[in-house]
């Protein structure tokens, strides 16, 4: 699928929702904004700001314009400079701040109030708390008994496509991107004439939990939107794992199709929704997913 096809799908989905399609994406620097890089250190600088991310720590560079262009082209830790054999103070502080932000988003919980505000049914895996979630990934792959009964009682049976949302390893990925990805995704699936299941939220879920969900509800395609493991300074990245006719006993990781890096600095959520709709349609046509699909 090329960029033109993606833009057509986005326009079609947004038109069906009565909204204007976003302008075509333009090449832009990888930092939040193209802030003019600065070289001086400041104790008062917000380490999460665009100015801090654009900071250049190399003193008296031979080609300052080259460093400026390099700094604007990536969010990687380049041009930070050294103080003898050690990193400069501001570079070290920003590293520690980014590490802290990533750690926080792993340990945070998605608020129950947020789930209720979205009108989502909430179920959970066999995990009861965050510590157990991080140490027992096997338990995060299975629904608890109460969740199984809730899905059977409250969800549409035998849908063409079942959409599931789970916190995963990043709560920010869910709460930040939800409103920009789920409405266009649901609208696009319905516009395609597909029978769409009841979307719901799984607390403490791992990727493989979608196999049990698909088996319980009899879904042809299961789409799991889950928070990615955060990187340094990037805690809002969402992934989509889609699988055709999942089964607990037989589905393996190669059967899944993954779309990752969904966030404003990567694949925009609205664009990702359009790609997922097209992916679901192709899965149903080919009756396959993962490495079994033909391009």
Curated annotation (Swiss-Prot):
Cofactor names from the entry are: adenosylcob(III)alamin
Where is adenosylcob(III)alamin bound in this sequence?
A: 207, 228, 258
GO MF entries: cobalamin binding; ethanolamine ammonia-lyase activity
Q: How is the cofactor bound?
A: Binds between the large and small subunits.
Highest taxon, organism lineage: Bacteria
State if Cell wall biogenesis/degradation is listed as a keyword. no
Q: Which GO terms describe its cellular component?
A: ethanolamine ammonia-lyase complex; ethanolamine degradation polyhedral organelle
Q: Which reaction does it catalyse?
A: ethanolamine = acetaldehyde + NH4(+)
UniProt xrefs under InterPro entries: EutC (IPR009246), EutC_C (IPR042251)
- Catalytic EC class: lyase
Pathway(s) annotated for this protein in UniProt: Amine and polyamine degradation; ethanolamine degradation
Instruction: Give one GO biological process term.
Output: amino acid metabolic process
For this protein, the Enzyme Commission number is: 4.3.1.7
Compartment(s):
Bacterial microcompartment
The alphabetized UniProt keywords are: Bacterial microcompartment, Cobalamin, Cobalt, Lyase
Similarity comment: family membership: Belongs to the EutC family.
Protein task? Catalyzes the deamination of various vicinal amino-alcohols to oxo compounds. Allows this organism to utilize ethanolamine as the sole source of nitrogen and carbon in the presence of external vitamin B12.
**NCBIfam families registered for this protein in UniProt:** PRK05465.1
Tell me the subunit arrangement: The basic unit is a heterodimer which dimerizes to form tetramers. The heterotetramers trimerize; 6 large subunits form a core ring with 6 small subunits projecting outwards.
Q: Write down what this protein is called.
A: Ethanolamine ammonia-lyase small subunit
Organism the protein comes from? Escherichia coli (strain SMS-3-5 / SECEC)
| Taxonomic lineage of the native organism | Bacteria, Pseudomonadati, Pseudomonadota, Gammaproteobacteria, Enterobacterales
């Amino acid at each position: 699928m090329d960029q033109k096809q993606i833009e057509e799908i986005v326009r079609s989905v947004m038109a069906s929702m009565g909204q204007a399609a976003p302008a075509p994406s333009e090449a832009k620097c990888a930092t939040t904004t193209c802030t003019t890089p600065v070289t001086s250190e400041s104790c008062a600088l917000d380490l999460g700001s665009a100015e801090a991310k654009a900071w250049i720590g190399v003193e008296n560079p031979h080609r300052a314009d080259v460093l400026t262009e390099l700094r604007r082209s990536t969010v990687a830790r380049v041009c930070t400079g050294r103080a003898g054999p050690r990193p400069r103070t501001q570079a070290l502080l920003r590293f520690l701040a980014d590490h802290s932000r990533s750690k926080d988003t792993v340990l945070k919980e998605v608020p129950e109030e947020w789930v209720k505000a979205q009108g989502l049914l909430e179920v959970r895996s066999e995990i009861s708390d965050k510590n157990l979630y991080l140490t027992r990934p096997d338990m995060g792959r299975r629904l608890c008994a109460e969740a199984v009964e809730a899905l059977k009682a409250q969800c549409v049976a035998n849908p063409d496509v079942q959409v599931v949302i789970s916190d995963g390893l990043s709560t920010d990925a869910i709460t930040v991107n939800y409103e920009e990805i789920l409405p266009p995704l649901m609208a696009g699936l319905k516009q395609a004439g597909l029978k769409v299941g009841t979307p719901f939220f799984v607390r403490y879920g791992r990727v493989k939990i979608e196999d049990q969900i698909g088996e319980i509800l009899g879904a042809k395609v299961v789409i799991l939107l889950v928070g990615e493991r955060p990187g340094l300074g990037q805690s809002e990245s969402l992934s989509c794992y889609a699988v055709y006719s999942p089964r607990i006993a037989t589905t393996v990781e190669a059967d899944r199709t993954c779309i990752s890096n969904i966030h404003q600095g990567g694949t925009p959520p609205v664009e990702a929704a359009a790609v997922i709709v097209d992916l679901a349609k192709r899965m149903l046509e080919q009756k396959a997913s993962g490495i079994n699909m033909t391009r």
